[in-house]
């Protein structure tokens, strides 16, 4: 079999979703590296005047940190510039989709869910999966998420729901659309 490509990501974590339809739902997050936008106008005093922008990430010495968690949160420009600026590339993880699935399972595992399943073995609650970035619908990230979802299906460990935090600029790949419909149909047939 063809060996899987490795993808750059900045972090995997779990938390309770705080926005939108899945507010309050336990969520596993994968934050991909790279974005097609930079959004330097965020938080600026004069967002329509780029010549006035302050971009604190630009002057930050990225060699002083070795973990994403130790970066400051910028209040001007993109608050997650570490997810796309090349100067932070040394902080990124690099794994195949199958390895990323294992990292996510490990993140989800605890004393009551030792296997890290999306369907909690005791409460029967289903965890949510959120792909974010960066831009999680750039072609490389779409490919990675499609392969990851296939691995989750093959392992009979399917997220209760899946969302993408996207800027909405990317064309959807055919395999992405196909795996999305598969996921929707699987949920429609559940009792």
Predicted regions: what they are:
Residues 30:
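Conserved, mostly hydrophobic/aromatic
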Residues 15-18, 80, 186:
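Generic structural "secondary-structure junction" signal
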Residues 2-20, 24:
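Auxiliary Fe-S-binding modules of radical SAM enzymes
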Residues 183-191:
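Single conserved hydrophobic/aromatic residue that forms the stacking wall/gate
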Residues 7, 37-178:
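Conserved Radical SAM active-site core
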């Amino acid at each position: 079999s063809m060996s899987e490509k490795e993808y750059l990501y900045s972090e995997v974590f779990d938390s309770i979703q705080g926005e939108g339809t899945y507010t309050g739902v336990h969520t596993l997050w994968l934050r991909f590296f790279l974005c097609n936008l930079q959004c330097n106008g965020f938080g600026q005093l004069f967002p329509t005047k780029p010549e006035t922008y302050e971009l604190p990430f630009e002057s930050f010495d990225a060699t002083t940190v070795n973990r994403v968690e130790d970066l400051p949160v910028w209040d001007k420009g993109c608050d997650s510039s570490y997810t796309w600026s090349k100067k932070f590339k040394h902080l990124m993880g690099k794994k195949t989709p199958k390895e990323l699935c294992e990292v996510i399972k490990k993140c989800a595992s605890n004393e009551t869910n030792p296997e890290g399943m999306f369907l909690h073995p005791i409460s029967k609650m289903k965890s949510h999966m959120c792909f974010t970035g960066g831009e999680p619908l750039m072609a490389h990230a779409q490919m990675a998420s499609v392969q990851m979802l296939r691995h989750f299906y093959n392992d009979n460990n399917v997220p209760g729901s899946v969302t993408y935090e996207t800027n909405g600029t990317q064309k959807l790949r055919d395999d992405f659309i196909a795996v999305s419909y598969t996921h929707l149909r699987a949920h429609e047939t559940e009792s």
